[in-house]
């Protein structure tokens, strides 16, 4: 393993200060988890960036279009061979102390809640 960013922000948004945490997985691999150090200014700037992206891009999508994008991402995460899922299955137990088999089961169960038909049910309920 190596350095792993454990955050997500709009592509054009840049964090300036980071913290790290070194973890060792049960297989002996190590990783440095990197995450932004947030202060009020960073949170306000990030919120403004998210609002701008919503107005410029997301607002153009239909509800079905948004559901489709989320459903495609969920399909990736339900695949046990998806590289990001495999990485999560190695790192989450090291960070949380949860048993690796429970993490695998719960990731699968959790992701299934966001498949297309379930998302459409959520939307219909709202």
Describe each PLM feature range.
Residues 1-126:
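N-terminal Rossmann-like NAD(P)+-binding subdomain of aldehyde/semialdehyde dehydrogenases
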């Amino acid at each position: 393993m190596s350095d792993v960013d454990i955050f997500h922000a709009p592509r054009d948004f840049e964090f300036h200060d980071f913290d790290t945490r070194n973890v060792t997985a049960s297989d002996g691999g190590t990783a440095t988890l990197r995450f932004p150090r947030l202060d009020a200014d960073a949170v306000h700037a990030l919120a403004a960036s998210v609002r701008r992206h919503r107005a410029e891009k997301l607002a153009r999508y239909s509800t079905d279009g948004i559901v489709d994008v989320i459903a495609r991402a969920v399909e990736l995460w339900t695949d046990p061979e998806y590289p990001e899922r495999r990485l999560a299955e190695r790192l989450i137990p090291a960070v949380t102390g949860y048993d690796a088999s429970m993490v695998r089961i719960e990731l699968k169960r959790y992701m299934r809640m966001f498949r297309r038909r379930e998302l459409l049910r959520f939307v219909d309920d709202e």
